[in-house]
Amino acid sequence: MASPRSAGGVGGGGGGGGGSGGAAAGDDAIWSKLREAGFDEESLKRRDKAALIAYISRLESEIYQYQHNLGLVLMERKELTSKHEQLRAASESAEIMHKRERAAQQSALAEARKKEENLKKSLGIQKECVANLEKALHDMRGETAETKVSYESKLAEALQLMEAAHKKFDEAEEKLLLAKSLEAESIRTHNAALRSLHDIDDREDQLRRDRISCELENEAKEKEISLQRKSLNDMKKILHEKEEVLLKEQALLNQRDENILERLAYVTHSEKRVEEEKNILEAERKVLLEEKYKLELKMEAIVSREEALIQKESLLDKRESELLILQETIASKERAEIERLNQEQAIALERRKHDFESEMANKQMSFDAAMEVTRNALHQRECALSEQESVVVQRSQNLDLQLAELASKEKALAGRSDELKEEEEKLLLHREAIHNELQKEREEIQRIKSDLEKEKAFFEEEKREAIQAQQDLAITQADRDELLTLQMKLKEEIDSLRAQKRELMADADRLQAEKERFEIEWELIDEKKEELQKEAIRIAEERRAITEYLKNESDIIKQEKDNLRVQFKSNSETLSREHKEFMSKMQQEHASWLSKIQQERQDLKRDIDIQRVELLNSAKARQMEIDSYLREREEEFEQKKAKELEHINSQKEMINTKLEHVAVELQKLKDERKEATLERERREQELSEIKGTIEALNNQREKLQEQRKLLHSDREAITVQIQQLNVLEELKIDSENKQLSLLQHDKSKLGSDINVKDNHHDNSHSSPKQRFGRKLDLSPVSTPISWVRKCAQVIFKRSPEKSASHDQFVQNGVPKKVGDSVDVEDVNLDFAKVGQKRLNHLVSCDQTEVLEPKRKHRRSTIQKVNGGEITSNCLSALEEKCSKNEHDEAPLGLSNTCKEHEYGDKGPENLTKPGEPASSVDVPYVNGIVDNSDSVQEEPSVEATVSATETSNVDGPEDNNDSDEEDEEEEEEKTSSAKKLWRFLIT
């Protein structure tokens, strides 16, 4: 119950300055009545003042806290809305980028399809190579199946990351809803505070009414005081006994307070244990976050390994650019399978991440549920403590009333009032301790809220990182697709894929081991979760025990309150009696008390004014602090916003640079493809030219083979003709030898038959001259010589000058000698000349063979018949050419000349000296004409032999010199023609 002065002060503060005079007059009247009743004004003022100040400060602090929480909630709402808009903008930009990349990919696929159509036209030539490479690819596909599975798992994990990001976004929206609900709760608490203020006003009105009723009762009791003074002496003894009882009760109260403190210590200990368990849960959460970070590091390692593989593939692309066309076709076939594998891998990654995020979400939900349970328990405890505080306040009010009534007693009761003051101070200290504990609990709640905000920010950062990772995965996915299409273009990729297979098998084993370890850890987490559930059950049981204990305590306090009420009633009755006794003393001391009350009233007004000014100043300072704090928070928020915008701009610039780099790389690849196509066209042209040259060479080869066959046939024909000529030559030499022997025999008979000589001379002068000039070419000796000359002229065409000079020489040689021979001696000399020349020629051949064997093989042999030259080296030259073509080392002409030389060696043995008789077999033949003359003189024969020997000795060296010069010229011509023919064959 408030004092009359405190009630008047509160009413004056609420009513304004207009009713201050009436309130002061009412206060004077009330205090005059109280002084008449015997109440102590100073004690009432002090107690009312302290209670009002404490209550006002508590209400102001609660209102300030509610306003502060409301401001924080509004700021959090603004931050969450801004972050939500940023995330939405980022997602829209990511979708736009994804659409652009998809369009670029579709255009690239269209270009690739066009290239495939163009390349299919050239597959006819490369079918055999493609068949071999398809066999290799069949082996390679079996090896790359496991790599494809790994890629599919990675793609699945990436999709799981995206789903987890969407779930986090949904969780953020749920948290926004929670923030809105908290805002609504704060509004409700504000309304409840306003209602409590209205209740306080109503209570003040009730207190005023109670005060009036008390004053009326006091007036009624003042009449009874005179009657009670008589029993005052008896009551003093009773009061002493009651004081002792009160001391005992105070000791009991102290013991109960100690018990309450012990129970509070136990509650704090249990709360500390709950906090320790919370720290353990935080540590486990950190461990899980570290595991998640390790998984992200592993993902980054896999990405770096993929980049290394991409670099290797680029190097292999540079080395194996010659197989670009074929491998592009292979890459187009394998592109669909690689994309499927990548998708399956992303799905596996997303599934794995989704499982991990779901586990984390379950843990967080369990943790949030535990925190909610603890929060509810703390709220219940706060309510219980508030009820206990209200009980204590009521108790303190009752004690204040009791002390106020006891203060009106005599100075003997001053000791008792002092003890009651000490008890009141203890109760105030206890109430302050309870208030401090409540403040600590509020701070813990605020700290938990801040932790939740931090976790919210952490999850939002994770969401941003997931979105960024998704964008990076989209960019790297496009790059990976392009590079994988280039990867299939390599001839040596089989070996690299096998090595990759081994590495991926090792990675698969490692991931299997990690999976098993993760399952083991998951089982451990489940066990820990079960333990935490058991601990939560135990904590709930403890809370139930605490609530039961608090209920019991509240029942005990209610019982004590009832006891105190009973005691208060008894005390009030005793005090009413004592009041009647002390009325006389109070009237006597009324004058002194009135002056003191006025002084104290002035002091109280001054103190109230000072406190009001201090409260206003403190409120202004607090408002300034709040404004400065809000400005600082706004500045920090603006700075964070600017930093985030800068970070977003930098990320956009990085993405633009990466896109430019990708465009440059694509342009380089296009240039390289163009260069490769140009190189391929150039090589095809070169191949066509080479094929044309090969066909031309084959045609020339066939022509040369035909020419060679013709030359072989010509050589065979010529060799046959040479053999025939050799046979004829031998027959000719035999006939000449016989003729020489006949001539010698005829010369021996010329001396005995002169008449026959004259007749024969006449006939030989008339007919042989004409016959020899007319039938020289028809003789059996001259016919094969002319035929050989014709063959030589056809095969080795001479210059017209040499042929003319040769013909002239023949004509000059033969007809002149034929024309000069008039008589039989000249004719016989001519026959002797012919035979002698043949013999001399054979001897000269033997000498030239001995002297110059090499030149003999190179040079043609010359035969002279009647002063004419016959070339017989044409066959040897032709055989030499044929031997050069067929690499023969033994020409046929050489064998024939050797036969002639052998025959020439035998010739001088068959020749008869002058004076020896000739054989009778050779007589009838003289140059193909039958000679029937049997009588030949001896003297002309001697002259003929001498002249024949002389002419042969004189003409022999000259003819040999001329023939050597002509042979050298002809040999030079033939060697030059042979060289030309050989060069033609080589080219």
Curated annotation (Swiss-Prot):
Give the main location.
nucleus
What InterPro entries would the database entry show?
Answer: CRWN (IPR040418)
The answer to whether the entry has keyword Acetylation is no
Query: Which cellular compartments is it found in?
Result: Nucleus matrix; Nucleus lamina
Q: Where is this region: Disordered?
A: 1-25, 752-775, 887-987
A biological process from GO: nucleus organization
Question: Biased composition, Acidic residues: where in the chain?
Answer: 956-973
Say what happens when this gene is deleted.
No visible phenotype under normal growth conditions, but mutant plants exhibit hypersensitivity to drought stress.
- Cite the record's Basic and acidic residues compositional bias ranges: 752-764, 898-908
Q: Where is the composition biased (Gly residues)?
A: 8-24
Q: What induces it?
A: Induced by abscisic acid (ABA) and drought stress (at protein level).
Q: Which residues form a coiled coil?
A: 403-545, 594-717
ATP-binding found in the keyword field: no
Stretches with biased composition (Polar residues): 944-954
Cellular component, GO annotation? nuclear lamina; nuclear matrix
Keyword terms, alphabetized: Coiled coil, Growth regulation, Nucleus, Stress response
Sequence similarity: Belongs to the CRWN family.
Note from the entry: Plants overexpressing NMCP1 exhibit enhanced tolerance to drought stress.
Cross-referenced PANTHER family: PROTEIN CROWDED NUCLEI 4
Complex and partners: Interacts with SWI3C.
Function, in words: Architectural component of nuclear structure that plays different roles in controlling nuclear size and morphology. Involved in the modification of chromatin accessibility by interacting with SWI3C, a component of the chromatin-remodeling complex, to thus reduce the suppression effect of the complex. Acts as positive regulator of drought resistance and modulates root growth. Positively regulates the expression of genes related to root growth and drought resistance.
Q: What is this protein called?
A: Nuclear matrix constituent protein 1b
Q: What organism, scientifically named, is this protein from?
A: Oryza sativa subsp. japonica (Rice)
- Per the record, the gene is NMCP1B
